Curated annotation (Swiss-Prot):
Similarity comment: Belongs to the uridine kinase family.
Entry keywords, A to Z: ATP-binding, Kinase, Nucleotide-binding, Transferase
Organism superkingdom: Eukaryota
Protein name as catalogued: Uridine-cytidine kinase D
CYTH domain sequence ranges: 290-460
Chain sites annotated for binding ATP: 117-124
A GO molecular function held by the record: cytidine kinase activity
Start-end of Low complexity biased regions: 468-483
Organism expressing this protein natively: Dictyostelium discoideum (Social amoeba)
Length: 492
């Protein structure tokens, strides 16, 4: 599919860089450049107990679905809104095709494209990708922040943006003038000179690039999101590096208390106005350097051998009790992030001492050993409340008793009882896949391992239950459960 797009996109640069050779299209009140494909969309499974993400219909496999028309109010030729949410690559190709169409219609037209979305959604990446292909001028809204007004390291308040300067810059560029614009480098204000390239394309990227004051200046508008959950992780990981804060929990606190409330209030409403809407499926967990490798098996299946092995260690196991709350993310429309996909869920672990730890992870099955890239750190009750205020909901609670029998050389062997499953498990964890596999072979569990997560097994058990109340999990069922089991949470 991507090759078909690329062969078509390869012509764009020549269209944009040699505009004198481009012929105008026929003047008509409404122009259809590509016949839209028939839509046969199915509503994906809204059931929270679903074990896998919904499968998207394969759209746009043959052609780009782009429509153009004359605006009856302005008299300008413009791109109609694409009525579907696109993948990152699809959105990139559609944006480039939209530029090509406008250029074909009026070779002298200066085209301004705006890209908006939450922090970490991929705005800069998309802008650079489009800019490199069409030789466009890229402007970041972040450079127009009034540094003297920044307080508490909050760069995300729209009142900090010098919109007057942004608007005057765009207008002057449209008049083919050379302009001096600000440039923030290491939190210090510098400046740079820019002018239009021969392609006559301006790309403005930033959280507020589709705000009401800027939209009238845009010829093409693009909204990009990755679901609050993925954006949250990406923001944490980037913030740890760039913010100068001491820990990831400080960054998370800032995001839950400042960044995403700002997004919900000031950015999200403008994204609905975009002509092209993109849902980025980039997985930030792939950036984690040291994943945890896990192998587990049911204890009762080989109880006698396990007991002999554990006894041979000649240790008194360390016993710990945990309560794991699983939060599923808020939803971005019908084509947004799947709440049913357990890979999108966040685990909040409460220890017997009242401490909370948050874990973002994906578990990938690979033979007898699962690979679990993860991000884990301690949080406060206030931060947990911040996540709930962003729209996260409690989907399940699993209580476990853990006996740590071995913890040496980076390998941990535990015997765990999951109350809700009413089963014991032997589990091996470590940062070396080879060492985890060696330990699993010694315990003779490589052929009897359980690859599924405890969360998956929990929902599988609920499905089999004859109790109609559990045939389909509803948020209220679990919310009432946590209130009952954690009455002392407010006292922490």
């Amino acid at each position: 599919m991507e090759n078909r797009y690329i062969s078509r996109i390869e012509t764009i640069s020549s269209h944009l860089l040699s505009t004198n050779d481009v012929s105008s299209q026929n003047e008509s009140e409404s122009i259809t450049f590509v016949k839209p494909l028939p839509k046969n969309k199915k509503d994906h499974d809204q059931s929270i107990e679903s074990d896998s993400s919904f499968t998207r219909e394969k759209q746009f496999e043959e052609e780009l679905d782009i429509l153009g028309e004359i605006n009856s109010k302005t008299g300008l030729f413009e791109i109609k809104q694409v009525p579907y949410q696109l993948s990152f690559d699809q959105g990139f190709f559609h944006a480039c095709r939209a530029i090509e169409i406008l250029t074909e219609k009026d070779p002298k037209r200066i085209i301004c494209l705006g890209i908006a979305g939450p922090v970490g959604a991929g705005k800069t990446t998309l802008a650079n990708k489009i800019g490199s292909l069409v030789n466009g001028v890229i402007i970041s809204l972040q450079d127009f922040v009034k540094l003297e007004n920044v307080k508490d390291n909050n760069y995300d308040d729209p009142v900090l943006i010098d919109f007057d300067k942004v608007i005057s810059t765009l207008n002057e560029l449209k008049e083919n003038k050379t302009v001096i614009i600000p440039k923030i480098v290491n939190r210090k204000m510098e400046s740079r000179s820019i002018s239009l390239s021969t392609s006559k394309v301006i790309i403005l990227e930033g959280a507020y690039a589709l705000s009401a004051r800027i939209r009238p200046l845009l010829d093409i508008s693009v909204a990009i999101t990755g679901g609050v959950h993925l954006d949250l992780i990406k923001s944490i990981m980037r913030g740890i590096v760039t913010s100068g804060k001491n820990s990831s929990k400080d960054v998370l606190a800032q995001i839950t208390n400042v960044v995403f409330p700002m997004f919900k209030a000031f950015v999200e409403p403008d994204l609905d106005q975009a002509k092209i809407k993109i849902h980025s499926s980039f997985n930030p967990m792939s950036q984690v350097v040291e994943p945890v490798y896990v192998c587990k098996a049911k204890y009762d299946n080989n109880k006698q051998f396990f007991d002999q092995f554990l006894s041979s260690l000649n240790v008194v196991p360390v016993k710990k009790n945990f309560s794991d709350m699983y939060l599923y993310p808020p939803k971005y429309g019908v084509d947004g992030i799947s709440q049913a996909d357990k890979r999108n869920w966040i685990r909040i672990r409460r220890s017997e001492h009242g401490q909370f730890n948050i874990t973002f992870y994906n578990e990938m099955m690979d033979g007898a050993v699962n690979t679990r890239p993860s991000l884990n750190f301690e949080i406060s009750v206030k931060t947990l409340g911040g996540l709930l205020s962003l729209g996260y909901q409690i989907g399940a609670i699993l209580n476990r008793t853990v006996e740590v029998w071995y913890d040496k050389n980076g390998v941990v062997i535990t015997k765990e009882y999951i109350k809700e499953l009413e089963k014991h498990f032997i589990q091996i964890k470590g940062h070396s896949r080879r060492e985890v596999l060696d330990s699993a072979e010694k315990l003779k569990i490589t052929g009897n391992h359980v690859p599924q997560t405890f969360l998956y097994l929990y929902f599988k058990k609920l499905k089999k239950s004859k109790n109609p109340n559990y045939s389909k999990l509803k948020p209220n069922n679990t919310n009432s459960k946590i209130l009952k089991n954690n009455k002392d949470k407010k006292n922490l």
